[in-house]
């Protein structure tokens, strides 16, 4: 996203993203509008909605339209804070290998970071993420790595209550919006999503979007 735009240009830019996204993601006009607002305001978002309503695809589409990079991490009870910063492994020669994790992999190009089922991760992971959200940086590899364009989207597992760690009110206050993603009520839209072959391969759907300038 270019920074040197007039207010009118930003408005046109936002409207164009919404228009393009609505051609790809059906029945989510309100959610798309709110997500675009949050991205332009650099405000983090809690997403509400069941499994399979298309949250991942929606965020991938929006990321492609605005330009920048997308990363996702899955919340589990085994996830540790370091897991989202770096990966440690042993290479073929038996030597340790350290690589950047999902939060740092794309560096300053990271636009959208999706934390799926955040309430399944431990509070220590929440603390690290909330600090990165506030400071827009992470200290790792003996230096500060800045994430100036990162907007965090997170959703919660609202079905399983075992081994979940709900966000306290103070943590939820770090999110600018809570946006509901629901299955479209219009039967024609639902039929199109289910039966139109264009929407069956979501990876191709996202890949075919032209890269934003």
Label for each model-derived stretch:
Residues 27, 47, 84, 129, ...:
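Residue-level signature of catalytic and energy-coupling elements of molecular machines
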Residues 36-77, 89:
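Walker A/P-loop
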Residues 79-95:
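Conserved NTP-binding/hydrolysis module of P-loop NTPases
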Residues 8-53:
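Pre-Walker A (pre-P-loop) alpha-helix and adjacent loop at the N terminus of AAA/AAA+ ATPase modules
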Residues 34-37, 91-114:
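Conserved alpha-helical scaffold flanking the Walker A/P-loop in AAA+ ATPase domains
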Residues 33, 40-42, 66, 107-109, ...:
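Short loop/turn elements that form and flank the Walker-type P-loop nucleotide-binding site
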Residues 47, 114-115:
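Hydrophobic anchor at the beta1->P-loop junction of P-loop NTPases
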Residues 91-94, 117-128, 133-213:
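Canonical AAA+ ATPase core
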